[in-house]
UniProtKB/Swiss-Prot annotation:
This is tRNA1(Val) (adenine(37)-N6)-methyltransferase. The lineage of its organism: Bacteria, Pseudomonadati, Pseudomonadota, Gammaproteobacteria, Enterobacterales. It is an enzyme of class 2 (transferase). Belongs to the methyltransferase superfamily. tRNA (adenine-N(6)-)-methyltransferase family. InterPro entries: DNA_methylase_N6_adenine_CS, SAM-dependent_MTases_sf, Small_mtfrase_dom, tRNA_Adenine-N(6)_MTase, tRNA_adenine-N6_MeTrfase. Its EC number is 2.1.1.223. Specifically methylates the adenine in position 37 of tRNA(1)(Val) (anticodon cmo5UAC). Keywords: Cytoplasm, Methyltransferase, S-adenosyl-L-methionine, Transferase, tRNA processing. It catalyses: adenosine(37) in tRNA1(Val) + S-adenosyl-L-methionine = N(6)-methyladenosine(37) in tRNA1(Val) + S-adenosyl-L-homocysteine + H(+). It holds the Pfam family MTS. GO terms for biological process: methylation; tRNA processing. GO terms for molecular function: nucleic acid binding; tRNA (adenine-N6)-methyltransferase activity.
């Protein structure tokens, strides 16, 4: 077996295969998961001209939005952790959109200090746990806890980098969103779209996807159950993710 073939097999044991790209995540604290896939499939991208992914991790969201957006759209991904940012660079380089994605290994505060508001869409699957029980590695604590990237800092940096008519999209647990939304409103954000997600159609929502705007408009609310009453993937979930999941 060639070194290249062996390398590809190793990647496929340590990552996630989508229809058009592969995400290796063995060097990332947070692996590919449903939250990120939902956000990447849902975020409104039709009028995007330039996209920013904050806390990119493996580069999943940047890759999903590259697949969904027009060929002229440029995507920047910012990731503080050096191992994760390197893996995001490798994932992007191996994808069909290598010339459209740029990965920056730095924190969002430093990144935003050097740039102007020229992003039409900003997306983030942010840390949302307050500091608590040790995770076993500093890398995982950084990805899970709001110690280094608080929601206030995230909102402030996104506000600084977003074009006036742009959207800032995040995914959060329902309980966290109850505190995040009032904080966002204090920073002059308005919820333009909200998708509440439940594991099953007869269960309460456990995640919320938000599209925030600097413009005040009436909020449009949606519901999505991942599985139906028979515990099969729901039609809505399949429709949303069919361009990505291999067997949808």
């Amino acid at each position: 077996m060639s070194h290249q073939a062996d390398y590809k097999l190793t990647l496929r044991r340590d990552g996630f295969t989508f229809k058009q790209f592969f995400v290796a995540h063995d060097r990332c604290a947070m692996k590919v998961g449903t939250d990120g896939i939902l956000l990447g499939a849902w975020a409104p991208v039709s009028s995007a001209t330039r996209v920013l992914d904050i806390g990119s991790g493996s580069g999943l969201l940047a890759l999903m939005l590259a697949q969904r957006s027009e060929p002229h759209v440029r995507i920047d991904a910012v990731e503080l952790d050096s191992a994760a940012s390197q893996q995001a660079k490798e994932n992007s380089a191996a994808s069909p959109w290598a010339d459209r994605i740029t990965v920056y290994a730095e924190d969002i505060v430093s990144f935003s200090a050097m740039r102007t508001a020229d992003y039409s869409l900003i997306i983030s699957n942010p840390p949302y746990f307050p500091p608590g029980i040790a995770c076993g590695s500093a890398q995982r604590e950084q990805a899970r806890y709001t110690t280094l990237l608080t929601h206030e800092v995230l909102l402030r940096c996104a506000h600084q980098l977003l074009m006036p008519e742009g959207l800032f999209c995040v995914v959060l647990p329902v309980q966290v969103a109850e505190h995040f939304i009032p904080l966002a409103q204090q920073h002059n954000w308005h919820v333009q779209q909200q998708l509440r997600v439940s594991e099953q159609e007869d269960k309460p929502a456990h995640r919320v996807l938000l599209a925030l705007s600097r413009q005040e408009k009436e909020c449009v609310n949606f519901l999505l159950a991942i599985r139906d009453a028979e515990r099969c993937y729901s039609t809505d979930f399949q429709q949303l993710t069919k361009d990505f999941y291999l067997f949808m």
